[in-house]
């Protein structure tokens, strides 16, 4: 009631970010294509098998679209603003899903012979303007890096939730992240963004990637509706 101007769709926040950072439709589509290509390759290699539990016969993410290209994306209508740049193809799809992780003390894990994937170093949250909701990971990641006494260059693996291509690109730019380190097996634009599951999914994925790639530090970060962000830095135990 007191702030009616703040009631808008997440898609409009993506358009706001695209305008603020002067991101073209093609730039966003390039990012979406990359996410789909990485997810397609990871799926063909069986990289997701360790991470997926079959439910009612479903054992594969349905959002992956191997044939995504510029021509296909060019045909899509603008989803939120007729004068904007964001389409369904550059947004994370609505998907059903669930994720779980086990967080415990190291002693408990060892006493119970549990496979330790990684160690949590620090986590941080931050707020931003609600109309620029997707920028939340910037401040949250900066806080987490400072608490961990690390720089972005020290981070080997980044799992950045792809709510929209525009906000992902903005976060990558402001955090100065090496694109080669981001979402190695694709992100939410290809895999989906089931509400309530994303934090566990990307953090668990980051831990799995540290082991697979034999790296030391990973950053898992996501935006949150109404103008928040969260970031977690984890360390390999290998």
Question: What is each stretch, according to the model?
Answer:
Residues 12-15, 58, 121-190:
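Active-site pocket-lining segment
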Residues 17-24, 29-31, 83-94, 156-163, ...:
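Cysteine-centered functional microenvironments
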Residues 71-135, 139, 146, 204-205, ...:
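Condensing-enzyme catalytic core mediating Claisen C-C bond formation in acyl metabolism
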Residues 152, 173-183, 188-226, 230-231:
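Internal helix-turn-beta structural module
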Residues 20, 26-111, 121, 174, ...:
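N-terminal extracellular/periplasmic Venus flytrap/periplasmic-binding protein-like
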Residues 13, 17, 39, 100-105, ...:
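Buried hydrophobic packing segments
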Residues 1-16:
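Flexible glycine-/small-residue-enriched beta->alpha junction loops
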């Amino acid at each position: 009631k007191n702030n009616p101007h703040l009631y808008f769709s997440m898609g409009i926040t993506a358009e706001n970010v695209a305008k603020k950072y002067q991101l073209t439709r093609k730039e966003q589509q390039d990012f979406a294509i990359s996410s789909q290509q990485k997810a397609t390759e990871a799926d063909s290699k069986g990289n997701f098998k360790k991470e997926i539990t079959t439910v009612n016969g479903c054992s594969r993410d349905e959002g992956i679209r191997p044939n995504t290209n510029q021509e296909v994306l060019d045909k899509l209508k603008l989803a939120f603003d007729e004068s904007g740049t964001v389409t369904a193809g550059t947004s994370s799809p609505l998907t059903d899903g669930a994720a779980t992780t086990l967080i415990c003390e190291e002693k408990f894990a060892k006493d119970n012979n549990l496979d330790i994937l990684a160690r949590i170093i620090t986590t941080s949250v931050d707020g931003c303007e609600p109309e620029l909701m997707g920028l939340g990971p910037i401040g949250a990641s900066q806080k987490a890096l400072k608490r961990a006494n690390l720089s972005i260059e020290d981070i080997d693996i980044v799992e950045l939730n792809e709510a929209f291509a525009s906000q992902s690109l903005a976060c990558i730019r402001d955090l100065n992240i090496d694109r080669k380190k981001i979402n190695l097996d694709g992100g939410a634009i290809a895999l989906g963004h089931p509400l309530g599951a994303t934090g566990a999914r990307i953090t668990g994925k980051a831990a799995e990637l540290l082991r697979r790639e034999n790296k030391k530090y990973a950053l898992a970060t996501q935006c949150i509706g109404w103008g928040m962000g969260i970031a977690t830095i984890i360390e390999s135990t290998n």
